[in-house]
């Protein structure tokens, strides 16, 4: 990571985030996806952040939980996320781990395009963010999400309606709160 403003305890967390985003591998080497991000960030940052968000949903248990459990138009704050997640993760993570993870996620929403631009955590009031539908999903991000979903589920064929089933985990609808209209429009 070279020269940076991260504290000693932040560096391992940031490396973990880069691995979850599939930007670096387990040996901290830039991946092919990471190089794609470097090559395209200047020209299409919104696409790159959408692809990063998709990867993090699949690779981070807490972010995956967020995508699958916080609904469109649902307001939240860190304390509420931690409380809800603790009920789900109490046997796997300590309360402090969950609190710190959601504190970091709130920072991602506040200081990266994942919040306002991708609509995952838009300012709602002084203390709350809200999750909205991300209506400007690119064809590339849509295709990538479908690929990740098919790969994760061993699927060879996908139907739009399957993404709206109650038991559907991850996928474009959960990742970006897509309405059926937006999803179908993106497929045309």
Question: What residue spans do the PLM features occupy?
Answer:
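Donor-sugar nucleotide-binding helix/loop cap in glycosyltransferases
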Residues: 1-188
């Amino acid at each position: 990571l070279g020269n940076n403003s991260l504290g000693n305890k932040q560096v391992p967390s940031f490396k973990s985030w880069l691995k979850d985003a599939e930007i670096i591998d387990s040996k901290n080497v830039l991946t092919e996806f990471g190089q794609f991000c470097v090559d395209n960030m200047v020209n299409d940052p919104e696409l790159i952040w959408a692809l990063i968000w998709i990867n993090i949903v699949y690779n981070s248990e807490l972010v995956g939980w967020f995508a699958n459990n916080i609904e469109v138009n649902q307001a939240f704050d860190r304390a509420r996320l931690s409380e809800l997640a603790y009920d789900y993760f109490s046997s796997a993570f300590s309360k402090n781990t969950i609190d710190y993870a959601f504190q970091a996620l709130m920072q991602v929403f506040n200081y990266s395009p994942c919040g306002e631009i991708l609509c995952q955590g838009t300012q709602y009031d002084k203390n709350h963010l809200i999750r909205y539908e991300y209506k400007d999903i690119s064809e590339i991000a849509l295709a990538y999400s479908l690929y990740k979903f098919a790969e994760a589920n061993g699927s060879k064929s996908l139907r739009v309606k399957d993404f709206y089933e109650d038991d559907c985990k991850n996928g474009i609808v959960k990742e970006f709160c897509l309405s059926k209209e937006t999803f179908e429009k993106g497929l045309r």
